[in-house]
Amino acid sequence: MGIADYFRERRRSRRGSASVAKERLQIIVSHERAERGGPDYLPMLRQELLEVVRRYVTVDPDAVRVDVERDGPHEVLELNITLPEREEEGAQR
């Protein structure tokens, strides 16, 4: 491998990282657009669900995610809650 090959290889890898960066940016932009187009009630729904879950489990507000996906004529409400890990049995007693 000569020095010229080394620089050619570096150029190829830069193109690869540029395409990866572009793809990631497209994902972020599409996610932001999807959030803007969501129903107006989602923030209130998220807050109320968080209050209900907190009656039973201590949950971080960032651990609740509410999304609406469109599948043809149907809308699907997706709710994800990351629950805290259980403590050991001996520590609770």
From Swiss-Prot:
- Keyword annotations for this protein? Cell cycle, Cell division
BP GO annotations: cell division; regulation of division septum assembly
Presence of keyword Ribonucleoprotein: no
UniProt key word Cell division? yes
Physiological role: Prevents the cell division inhibition by proteins MinC and MinD at internal division sites while permitting inhibition at polar sites. This ensures cell division at the proper site by restricting the formation of a division septum at the midpoint of the long axis of the cell.
Family listed? Belongs to the MinE family.
Name under which the protein is recorded: Cell division topological specificity factor
